[in-house]
Structure formats: C-alpha cells, structure tokens
UniProtKB/Swiss-Prot annotation:
InterPro entries in the record: Formate_THF_ligase (IPR000559), Formate_THF_ligase_CS (IPR020628), P-loop_NTPase (IPR027417)
Organism: Corynebacterium jeikeium (strain K411)
Gene giving rise to this polypeptide: fhs
Any GO BP annotation: tetrahydrofolate interconversion
Family: Belongs to the formate--tetrahydrofolate ligase family.
UniProt: ATP binding residues: T77, P78, A79, G80, E81, G82, K83, S84
Name recorded for this polypeptide: Formate--tetrahydrofolate ligase
C-alpha cells in the first residue's frame, strides 16, 4: 500500500519506518496475548511459532471465544487499496480502546514482493514487523510448502519410472510443481527429457506456491492429523482407465506431512503499535481461497476479545470464500465486516467519475449483507482526496444506509482509526454469540452440485446472468460426477479487477456470462477450483519489477521494500 496519507507532509518509506521502530521482545508480545512460555517456539528475538497442542493443553478448561471482524474491500486498482494497512491500524485502535486484540492475517508471497507489490505487511505507521523478515523468508513456511509440493511431484514421476504399478497415465498427471516466484516461463514445461534414465517425458508446469493445493490444505487443516488425512486425499492424476490416483496411493502422505510439521504452527509477530499478530498461510484470493490459516484464526479467537482477519481482494473473491469455504470448514461466526474503499478506486471503477464508481462499492456492500452481516465502510484517505469527494462518499453512505467512517492509518497508525474502531466496536458489542451464529451464513449449499453453486455465485455475487462451461470444463464436470466430487464447495479463480471474468469490465457490470474453462478437483483441500477467464496460476513479473528497487547494504540493512 503506497502513500495513502491524509496529509501532504513527506513521510519516510515503509521499510524506513519499520527499521526505525524498536520492536518489543517476542516474549513480551506472547505474554500480552496470553500465550504461556511452554507454547512458544522463538525464532530469534522478534518472531516465534506457537505450539498449538501445547497451548491447548495449557489452556484446557478455559472457555473463551473472541468476536471475529472480517476486513474486505471494494474492487481494487492494481496498486491495492490498503486493506491490510487499514486492518492493522484498526487493530491498534481497538487495543487502544481497551480490548484484548489480535490480528490474524496471511503471510506475503515472495513473488508479488519482487513483482508489483514490493512488500505486503501493511504500510506507513500501520505495519506488522519485522517487515523485512515477513516479506522475504519469514519462518520458512512458504519454503516448506514448496518442498512438500515438489516432493509429491517427484514421487509421482518416480513411481512411473520404476514400473508404474498403479498404472498412472503420464498424459493425465495433474499435479504441478510450484515455486514462490513470479516466473511466466515455467507455466508450461516438459519434464523427463534426456533418455530412458531421466524419467518419462511429459507435459507439466509450475504454479506459484500461494496457489498450490498444499497451501490451501495447510490453511484449512485443524491439526496435524487432519493435515495428514487431507494430504492423503490429494488427487495427482489418473490411471490409463481414468481412475483417480492420490498421494495416499503413492504412500507418501506421512513424508509430505513431516515436511510440514513445523509449518502448521502459526507465526507470532507484532504491529508497530504492539498488538500481537498471527501471520500464517498465504493463499491468493484470485487464484486460491484467499484466507489465512484456520488454525491461526481459531487460536486468536481462543486468546482474545476481538480478532481482526482479512480475506483477499473484494466481496466477490476473498470474502465470499471466507464465508463459503473457510467459515464452513471451521464453523466460524463473523460479528462485523469492514469494507475498505478509496477515492482512487471509486474513480478507477467509474472511468474517472467518482459518482459512477460508487456502484461498485454499493454492490460489495450488498454482497456482504447477503451473508447476513451488516458492514462498515472504511474510507482510506489519500492526500489527493478533496473535501468534496469525501463528502460525496459520506452522502452516498447515508442514502444507501451504510455507515462510512474515514481513516488515515498510513499517516497516523492506530490514532487514524479511532473513529473506525468506535464504529466497529459498536457493531461487535451489539452482536451476541447467538446472533452471530444465526445471522452470518453461506450463500450456497454444496449438496446442490457444482453447476448450481456456480450459477448462484454468478448471479448473486458477480451480477451475471448465466454460466457457460467450456469443452474442458464439461469433461471435468463429468469426471467430478463419476467420482462423487460434484457436491463440494467451489473456489472460483477469477480476476480481482471486475465482478465479471473480464478484467476490463470495471464498476458493477451485470447481465454478463461467467465463462468456466476448467474444473479442478482439490480433494485434499475439500473444494473444486473453477478456472474462469484468462486467470493464470503462476503470475509473471511486470515490465519494471519491484526487485529493481530492492537492495541491501554492507551491514545487511535492506532498502526498497515499500
């Protein structure tokens, strides 16, 4: 998130602000969160993992469940609208208001950090720190997921090489390798070249780690045992007679789980304001389910009064998947939802006309209401915003019956979200556990089938009139039905820039057709991925990647991260 200051005063870069801040010892943050020493696994002085089984044992008999606040956004510009930044500033403001507070968000992917984003741990004076560590290697979770994914790929090819007892058809191997780098040249590759001793030649490819099934599994598993069961169910391909082959068939679920033994533990860090933050798991919302790990969220809810979490991009992507996939898997109830908006994005979605762009925000608010939750709109201020523009958004809020609260957390940190915290806490305090459980809900029932689910999402959330299945999607649908997988939740892979599958159709398009090109069974994760439009599961670098600005000096101090 860049330069969303409500003032025109020069401000240091995000990394300069983070490096100038004196971090509290992670033991102090753990104590503030109520995490006993026996459940803390330090990674240096400012990072740690939480041993969740040890924490549960230490807290046995303690019946505490916090209120969950979900932060989403309107359709973004390519630069993003500061959703994470607002969440972090809001969390600091809620803690300042006297509530025991925790943040539970995703960890950044190295690909976008080196690509277009240049960092993804908040911005300005609303950051999670140590930001350099979080944005680069952190505690190694991404590497563990990458290693697990590629080990499974190696096991598939090795089985084919050594007799192929399962009868795997190399032409129908669906398991792809992954890496945490934006590299378009690896989307489609041929492996096994070089002769009989080098493997069986076949077409394959790479996905970015954040889009891998093992990332999704890690983020939806409830514990290590559940993780291993889910990994065993991963479908890696088909036999010559079209039967599915799983990781369990390859007898490697235990080995893959062993690689993830430590990665399943949530990571504990802190905001600039000293609020404990669990940063764990990082599936993208446009090509995956877009939510942090279920283990981190439930752990935070067990420890705090108020937990703030986010779901990637807008109500049509991360928020929908939060309610329909993550919430369903973890039986989560949402007490309040914040929709982040900016004048910049309103103009972008209105072809430079702010008033026209309000239709986009209006649909996002309407979508959230369909999940049974009344949202608060957070208007994230920029120095370029005029009083007239801000007034127009406020007037729209009154007319549409939704509360709009301005915030300036990039420039002011938690102090810039004091009014927003008041508004959100009013909603949270007005919702009992019973109310949250009975009101927040999913928008479809998987038992109705994949076709019905996609039609519901297309018409109710995207504003579409119809769904069109391409030739490959129709074949995939038949395969799903043959194996009894057509009644799973659906994770739609779709552009984040539009309610349609066309990234150029900004605003609030309606009456369009959702084009589904493939249906991919992610049985370990427990859902079916619907690939739409031209979305790629391995991004490429832009013409001027953020990596060109990132540097490190002789003392090891990193610069160039936003």
């Amino acid at each position: 998130m860049t330069n969303s200051s409500a003032t025109s005063n020069p401000q240091p870069s995000d990394v300069e602000i983070a490096q100038a801040h004196t971090l509290e010892p992670i033991t102090t943050i753990a104590e503030r969160a109520g995490i006993p020493e026996a459940a803390l696994i330090p990674y240096g002085r400012t990072k740690a993992k939480i041993d969740v089984p040890a924490l549960r044992a230490e807290r046995e008999g303690v019946n505490k469940k916090g209120k969950l606040v979900l932060v989403t956004a309107m359709s973004p510009t390519p630069a993003g609208e500061g959703k994470s930044t607002v969440l972090i500033g809001l969390a600091d403001a809620v803690r300042t208001a006297g509530r025991q507070t925790m943040v539970a968000i995703r960890e950044p992917s190295q690909g976008p950090v080196m690509g277009i984003k240049g960092g993804a741990a908040g911005g300005g004076y609303a950051q999670i720190v140590p930001m350099e560590d979080i944005n680069l290697h952190f505690t190694g979770d991404m590497h563990a997921i990458t290693a697990a994914t590629n080990t499974l790929a190696a096991m598939v090819d090795n089985h084919v090489q050594h007799g192929n007892a399962l009868g795997i058809d190399p032409r129908r191997v669906t398991w792809r390798r992954c890496l945490d780098v934006n590299d378009r040249s690896l989307r489609h590759v041929v492996t096994g070249l070089g002769g009989p001793g080098q493997g069986t030649p076949r077409e394959g490819g790479f996905d970015i780690t954040a889009a891998s099934e093992i990332m999704a599994i890690l983020c939806l598993a409830t514990d290590l045992e559940d993780l291993k069961k889910r990994i065993g169910r991963i479908v890696v391909g088909q036999t010559y007679d079209r039967r599915p082959v799983t990781a369990g068939d390859l007898k490697c679920a235990g080995a893959i789980t062993a690689l993830l033994r430590d990665a399943i533990n949530p990571n504990l860090v802190q905001t600039l304001g000293g609020t404990p933050a669990l940063v764990h798991g990082g599936p993208f919302a446009n090509i995956a389910h877009g939510c942090n790990s279920l283990i981190a969220t439930t752990t935070a809810l067990d420890l705090s009064e108020v937990v703030l979490t986010e779901a990637g991009f807008g109500s049509d992507l991360g928020a929908e998947k939060f309610f329909d996939i993550k919430s369903r898997a973890g039986d989560l109830d949402v007490a309040a939802t914040v929709v982040v908006a900016t004048i910049r994005s309103l103009k972008h979605n209105g072809d430079s006309v702010l008033k026209a762009g309000l239709a986009n925000l209006e649909r996002h608010v309407s979508n959230i209401r369909k999940f049974g939750v009344e949202p608060v709109v957070a208007l994230n201020l920029f120095s370029s915003d005029t009083a007239a523009e801000r007034s127009m958004v406020a007037d729209w809020g009154e007319q549409f019956g939704v509360r709009v609260v301005e915030c300036s957390v990039w420039a002011e940190g938690g102090a810039g979200a004091a009014d927003l915290a008041t508004a959100v806490l009013e909603v949270v305090d007005g919702v009992s556990d019973e109310d949250a459980s009975s009101s927040s809900h999913q928008i479809y029932q998987p038992v109705d089938g994949v076709e019905a689910t996609l039609h519901t999402l297309a018409t109710e959330i995207y504003g579409a009139a119809d769904v069109q299945f391409g030739p490959q999607a129709l074949k995939d649908l038949a395969f799903l039905k043959d194996n009894g997988w057509d009644k799973l939740p659906v994770c739609v892979s779709k552009t984040q820039y539009s309610f349609s599958d066309d990234p150029s159709a900004l605003g609030a398009p309606s009456g369009h057709t959702l084009h589904v090109r493939e249906l991919v069974p992610r049985i370990g994760a427990g859902f079916v991925v619907a690939l739409t439009g031209d979305v790629m599961t391995l991004p490429g670098l832009p013409k001027k990647p953020a990596a060109e600005r990132i540097d490190v000096n002789a003392q090891g101090v990193i610069s160039g991260l936003f």
